[in-house]
Amino acid sequence: MPFTYHRTINFQDTDAAGVVYFANILSICHEGYEASLRTSGISLKEFFTNPSMAFPIVHASVDFLRPLFCGAQVIISLVPQKIGAEKFEINYEIYLADVLVAKAVTRHVCIDANTRSKQELSMEIIQWLDGYRKDTEEVERRKAREVV
């Protein structure tokens, strides 16, 4: 089952046109990512300040399907998946009520924080990813249908 994160769109999330500023949707998605880690029992303090490893985002994309305004109650549905020994990506779907309003993807690479070289994912992250394995298969099927 995908992880769901509930969020209200705040005034600070919007631009002069009154809709969510394009870069802020990634920030909101990242909040969902952090909530997913926390819910899985991963200490955010240790995860983000661990001096031995880091997980930088090396790719991000967003497709906006409808505008989001201040006060909107959205649900971020996310599914992380392992895509290599040292990387994973997270697929996000942002809903307003039952309407899909945006989709996003972030790709993360595990690196040694000192040498900045790639390293294999930690067991903690592999366990987190394994918790979503069945959902990953459904995401892949949906992506395949979109291409056709």
Swiss-Prot record:
InterPro entries: 4-hydroxybenzoyl-CoA_TE, DHNA_CoA_hydrolase, HotDog_dom_sf. It holds the Pfam family 4HBT_2. The keyword Mitochondrion does not apply. One of its GO terms (molecular function) is fatty acyl-CoA hydrolase activity. Pathway: Cofactor biosynthesis; phylloquinone biosynthesis; Quinol/quinone metabolism; 1,4-dihydroxy-2-naphthoate biosynthesis; 1,4-dihydroxy-2-naphthoate from chorismate: step 7/7. Belongs to the 4-hydroxybenzoyl-CoA thioesterase family. DHNA-CoA hydrolase subfamily. The active site is at residue 15. Catalyzes the hydrolysis of 1,4-dihydroxy-2-naphthoyl-CoA (DHNA-CoA) to 1,4-dihydroxy-2-naphthoate (DHNA), a reaction involved in phylloquinone (vitamin K1) biosynthesis. It comes from Nostoc sp. (strain PCC 7120 / SAG 25.82 / UTEX 2576). It comes from the Bacteria. It catalyses: 1,4-dihydroxy-2-naphthoyl-CoA + H2O = 1,4-dihydroxy-2-naphthoate + CoA + H(+). GO terms for biological process: phylloquinone biosynthetic process. This is 1,4-dihydroxy-2-naphthoyl-CoA hydrolase. Its EC number is 3.1.2.28. Keywords: Hydrolase.
